[in-house]
Amino acid sequence: MSVNPLIAKITESQLRNDIPDFRAGDSVRVHARIVEGSRERIQIFEGVVIKRRGEGISETYTVRKISNGIGVERTFPLHTPRVDKIEVTRHGRVRRAKLYYLRALHGKAARIPERRRG
């Protein structure tokens, strides 16, 4: 199914080009803009990417972290202006594109080994 050229042109102008290369298993720090009343601040959400889905303007990724012993997952649109920047802190070595199995693991079992580059 072909995309309407007008829609393609509009979405092309909305795509961000400052996104680092990351995939499932990588640890990232997402600097999200939070609006509280009239104030705006940056909130850092640090965790492991457990999935990426979609393509183009509708692409999203989900980051999982453990906060006070409770697993917290947050899904971000990849090309949203609400995310100030994405930092990749380490690249994980995994064999899956979706890491849902991490939800059942706790402590050291939930660690992901680092991927060696080179």
From Swiss-Prot:
Q: Which UniProt keywords apply?
A: Ribonucleoprotein, Ribosomal protein
Q: Which PROSITE patterns match?
A: RIBOSOMAL_L19
Output one GO MF annotation: structural constituent of ribosome
InterPro entries the UniProt entry points to:
Ribosomal_bL19, Ribosomal_bL19_CS, Ribosomal_bL19_sf, Translation_prot_SH3-like_sf
List the Pfam families hit by this protein, alphabetically.
Ribosomal_L19
Q: Which GO terms describe its biological process?
A: translation
Q: Write out the GO cellular component annotations.
A: cytosolic large ribosomal subunit
Look up the coiled coil feature and give its residue ranges.
Answer: none
Superkingdom: Bacteria
**NCBIfam families (alphabetical):** rplS_bact (TIGR01024)
Q: What does this protein do?
A: This protein is located at the 30S-50S ribosomal subunit interface and may play a role in the structure and function of the aminoacyl-tRNA binding site.
Instruction: Give the record's family classification.
Output: Belongs to the bacterial ribosomal protein bL19 family.
Q: What is this protein called?
A: Large ribosomal subunit protein bL19
Q: Which organism is it from?
A: Ligilactobacillus salivarius (strain UCC118)
Name of the gene this protein is made from: rplS
